[in-house]
Amino acid sequence: MKIKNMMSVDLEDYFCDLPFEKWSQYESRVLKTTNKILNLFEKNKVKATFFTLGYIGEKFPDLIKEIDSRGHEIASHSYAHLDIRKVTREKFEDDLKKSVEILEKITGKKILGFRAPYFSIDKKSFWAMEILSKYFKYDSSIFPVKTPLYGIKNAPRNMYKPNLINPIITDAKINLIEIPMATDRIPIIGNIPIAGGFYLRFLPYFYMKYGLKKINKNKKSFIFYIYPKDLDSEMPKIGEYTWHHYHNLKNSTKKFEKILNDFEFTTIKEYLKI
């Protein structure tokens, strides 16, 4: 029997990497791209956790209701796609509360989990963990790699309870569960990200499959993630965006379907039995 893993979607629009005040300049594509993902999940009998921007919930409440009605889980991805490393504690918590209030009002269910935009919990923003522990049962923001954009290379690679002052240290007394993004460890080189998103588009499929299978062979589960824009071969060009936003979009849907076929997935809530 295949090991159950966790599937997640970071539910945001293609322009959400831009400053919030510029978002109104762009035409939304999130309904089209999210429905594509929902249909792929239905076809492959997959349930997922949708880390949802409060902004998206505010603009498209019927989309959130549809996701919820199909048996998927709604979790928080903040309200305005904040980089936690660049804001104050007060601004972060206010944004977080706004997101949770919007999503809980739409679904009528408690929001149990969070993922930081840009995976922006690292050594500059460890303070955020204490705030997260007040609102959530789990977090999935830590990426145990080191890239120019994010990551904590020496963080645990498997699910754990993080110390709230230094979350790369485990602390069994903490109620918050951390679910790090999937990596493959290569001697000398270190951890290679294989969790989805850009890496789904960039890495050869055979290597991603190999790395994820290796996790399951060790009797561990992994979490995978996708953005709606990752499957949008017609994503509009944005001048501020670099090559990695558009790389290999034409082949991404086919690769994602292979992931859905080759592994078993469920929601984080169902996996954790919470």
Question: How should these model regions be labeled?
Answer:
Residues 1-70:
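Active-site beta->alpha N-cap acidic-glycine motif
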Residues 10, 77, 81, 227:
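Histidine-centered divalent metal-coordination motifs
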Residues 16, 44-125, 136, 141-148, ...:
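Metal-dependent polysaccharide deacetylase catalytic core of the NodB/CE4 family, i.e.
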Residues 21-27, 90, 239-245:
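Short glycine-enriched, charge-decorated loop/helix-capping segments at active-site entrances
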Residues 34-38, 61-65, 93-100, 129, ...:
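Generic structural signal for well-ordered alpha-helices
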Residues 42-45, 138, 202-274:
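C-terminal domain-boundary segment and adjacent tail
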Residues 105, 109-110, 116-219:
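Active-site-adjacent pocket scaffolds in enzyme catalytic domains
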